[in-house]
Amino acid sequence: MAEKEEVKLLGIWASPFSRRVEMALKLKGIPYEYVEEILENKSPLLLALNPIHKKVPVLVHNGKTILESHVILEYIDETWPQNPILPQDPYERSKARFFAKLVDEQIMNVGFISMARADEKGREVLAEQVRELIMYLEKELVGKDYFGGKTVGFLDFVAGSLIPFCLERGWEGIGLEVITEEKFPEFKRWVRNLEKVEIVKDCVPPREEHVEHMNYMAERVRSS
């Protein structure tokens, strides 16, 4: 009989970065222990496992610590090969990694960090910059159910956890509509497809609480 594996995930309920890791673990069918962290009072365990960044997510697998959501997703895919989340083709895999960085670096910074600090006029300028970036994702989705084709995978988890199930809730809290059906029909169709996937639905934070949390996070950014 195979020895039981230790798989533990430290996360925060509203964090898109830990939610995407949960999506991957659920897709792979990997049993895991989830440890909820508190943003303002991080546990000694988290600080010991991630002393450099002191952030979630942290994955612990048989005593080994894996940090940063993109790295964790790739580790999960390589460790448990069933239901692959990264494309098998090297070129498609490179594109998925590129667009994942676009989401987490550029769209996140413009659509949340900069927007939280901007006044109303500045937000409109930043919203247009976000639209220009999301248009690249819109083009990638033409003719596809998901970024990888017919099944959810790496880029769906990264972009889905951050944009429709996080940033859009922040924009909702300040009364700003950034992504419209008219301008982004493929993106909106993709979101509807994601909302039907059981493992995704299981990991999406409750809307009202999340909108409140995003308002709180924006306040933290403004006061930092």
UniProtKB/Swiss-Prot annotation:
Positions contributing to glutathione binding: S15, P16, N41, K42, K55, V56, E68, S69
Organism expressing this protein natively: Arabidopsis thaliana (Mouse-ear cress)
Protein's UniProt name: Glutathione S-transferase U5
GO cellular component terms given for this protein: cytoplasm; cytosol; peroxisome; plasma membrane; plasmodesma
Residues making up the signal peptide according to the UniProt record: none
InterPro entries found in the cross-reference section: Glutathione-S-Trfase_C-like, Glutathione-S-Trfase_C_sf, Glutathione_S-Trfase, Glutathione_S-Trfase_N, GST_C, GST_C_Tau, Omega/Tau-like, Thioredoxin-like_sf
Catalyzed reactions: RX + glutathione = an S-substituted glutathione + a halide anion + H(+)
Pfam families hit by this protein: GST_C, GST_N
Cell compartments where the protein resides: Cytoplasm, Cytosol
Residue intervals of the GST C-terminal domain: 89-217
Residues annotated with Phosphothreonine modification: T151
Gene name of this polypeptide: GSTU5
Function: In vitro, possesses glutathione S-transferase activity toward 1-chloro-2,4-dinitrobenzene (CDNB) and benzyl isothiocyanate (BITC). May be involved in the conjugation of reduced glutathione to a wide number of exogenous and endogenous hydrophobic electrophiles and have a detoxification role against certain herbicides.
Keywords per UniProt: Cytoplasm, Detoxification, Phosphoprotein, Stress response, Transferase
Domain annotation GST N-terminal: ranges: 5-84
Annotated family: Belongs to the GST superfamily. Tau family.
One annotated GO molecular function: glutathione binding
Listed EC numbers: 2.5.1.18
Source organism superkingdom: Eukaryota
UniProt enzyme class: transferase
Gene Ontology biological process terms from the UniProt entry: glutathione metabolic process; response to oxidative stress; toxin catabolic process
Induction text: By auxin.
